[in-house]
Curated annotation (Swiss-Prot):
Keywords: 2Fe-2S, DNA-binding, Iron, Iron-sulfur, Metal-binding, Repressor, Transcription, Transcription regulation. This is HTH-type transcriptional repressor NsrR. Nitric oxide-sensitive repressor of genes involved in protecting the cell against nitrosative stress. May require iron for activity. Its cofactor is [2Fe-2S] cluster. GO terms for biological process: negative regulation of DNA-templated transcription. Residues 28-51 bind DNA. The keyword Transcription applies. Binds 1 [2Fe-2S] cluster per subunit. InterPro entries: TR_Rrf2-type_CS, Tscrpt_reg_Rrf2, Tscrpt_rep_HTH_NsrR, WH-like_DNA-bd_sf, WH_DNA-bd_sf. Residues 2-129 form the HTH rrf2-type domain. Pfam families: Rrf2. [2Fe-2S] cluster binds at C91, C96, C102. It comes from Escherichia coli O157:H7 (strain EC4115 / EHEC).
C-alpha cells in the first residue's frame, strides 16, 4: 500500500515537530524548507492535523506550530486513519459490474486493517526518540 503524499508529508511534519526540543515552536515555512514541499500543501496538512488535535497552531508574532499532545500519545496508525483515504478500490456498481459477487473488497479491507493494526504498535515517540541520525538530517541537534 502506498500512502498519498498528503499522509507522507503529514507524518514527516509530525516527525519534525517531535524531533524538536519539547515545547519549541516551529513554523510551516520551516517544515516546508526541511522537506521541500509547497507551502500551500503543507498548510492544508497542518490544518487537518490541527483539527485532529495532533498539532497546536498559535497565531501572532510569537506564534507557530508544535505537537498538540506528547509524541508518546500519537499512534502512527491513528494519524494514517486521519489523513489517508483508505478506500483501495472503487466498488460502486457503476464502475464494476462484478460488485454484487466480488470478494476483493473484503480481502483488501482486511489487508488495510492489518496494515493499520501494525502501525498502531508505533507511536511518534518510537520513531524519533534517541534517533541521532534523524536529528542530524533534520538539523535539530
Amino acid at each position: 500500500m502506498q500512502l498519498t503524499s498528503f499522509t507522507d508529508y503529514g507524518l514527516r511534519a509530525l516527525i519534525y515537530m517531535a524531533s524538536l526540543p519539547e515545547g519549541l515552536m516551529t513554523s510551516i515555512s520551516e517544515v516546508t524548507d526541511v522537506y521541500g514541499v509547497s507551502r500551500n500543501h503543507m498548510v492544508k496538512i497542518i490544518n487537518q492535523l490541527s483539527r485532529a488535535g495532533y498539532v497546536t497552531a498559535v497565531r501572532g508574532k510569537n506564534g507557530g506550530i508544535r505537537l498538540g499532545k506528547p509524541a508518546s500519545a500519537i499512534r502512527i496508525g491513528d494519524v494514517v486513519r486521519e489523513l489517508e483515504p483508505l478506500s483501495l478500490v472503487n466498488c460502486s456498481s457503476e464502475f464494476c459490474h462484478i460488485t454484487p459477487a466480488c470478494r476483493l473488497k473484503q480481502a483488501l479491507s482486511k489487508a488495510v486493517q492489518s496494515f493499520l493494526t501494525e502501525l498502531d504498535n508505533y507511536t511518534l515517540a518510537d520513531l524519533v526518540e534517541e534517533n541521532q541520525p534523524l536529528y542530524k538530517l533534520l538539523l535539530v541537534e
